[in-house]
Design a protein with these regions (language model features):
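Extracytoplasmic
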Residues: 34, 52, 87, 105-107, ...
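Bacterial N-terminal signal peptides
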Residues: 9-18
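Surface-exposed patches in mature extracellular/periplasmic domains of secreted proteins
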Residues: 49-64, 76-85, 100, 133-148
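Short, surface-exposed glycine/acidic/tryptophan-bearing loops
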Residues: 63-116
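Sec/Tat signal peptide C-region and signal peptidase I cleavage site
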Residues: 19-23
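Disulfide-stabilized extracellular recognition modules
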Residues: 112-174
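A short alpha-helix/helix-coil micro-patch that ends at or immediately precedes a cysteine
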Residues: 27-75
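Bacterial N-terminal signal peptides that target proteins for export
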Residues: 1-8
Length: 174
């Protein structure tokens, strides 16, 4: 559990959900950290290299991502599902409503690390996973929310280590 020990864990499953339908967007104030801003810039640069549209920042998706990062850090688990076992899309839907929309879909990429991580590291890890790469390059996505949470002495799967948990939630509503 020494600080010098470097472990990077990446959930190899990137999920996508698409129940039809639903809600009016509004923009609660959310300030992005330097890491979160860098992840947004780098994802959009990657998408531009592949001739895909730039993702718009979504305060609602960012709030969903932060809530999940906090829950995983506090409860000591790492998964797309919520602590109660509910599907990730149901959690995201509480923040990024689907009502009043004909089409609604969300996806999510996660990672955690015991070392400082930058946006290049995050994208490199996600790029190595076919499921995560598909989320990064999904042409349907229009919006993104990002959370990079630093948790000291995180319990459970994190073994009491200081960790960084990064959650990106992707979405489209039309």
């Amino acid at each position: 559990m020494a600080a010098a020990r470097r472990i990077v864990a990446l959930l190899a499953l990137a999920l996508v959900a698409s129940p039809a339908a639903l809600a009016a967007p509004s923009r609660p104030a959310v300030a992005l950290s330097t890491l979160e801003r860098s992840v947004l810039v780098d994802i959009n640069a990657l998408r531009a290299q592949h001739h895909l549209s730039k993702l718009r920042f979504s305060a609602r998706l960012t709030t969903a991502a932060l809530a999940h990062s906090q829950q995983m850090a506090n409860d000591g688990y790492f998964a797309h599902e919520s602590a109660d076992g509910s599907a990730f899309w149901k959690r995201v839907q509480r923040f990024y409503a689907s009502s009043q929309w004909r089409f609604w879909s969300v996806g999510e990429n996660l990672l955690w690390s015991v070392r400082d991580i930058d946006s290049h590291d995050a994208l490199s890890l996600w790029w190595e996973s076919p499921e995560h790469r598909r989320n990064l390059l999904n042409p349907a996505w229009r919006e993104i929310g990002i959370s990079a949470l630093h948790a000291a002495q995180a319990p459970g799967i994190y073994g009491g280590l200081d960790v960084t948990i990064v959650t990106t939630d992707f979405g489209v509503r039309r």
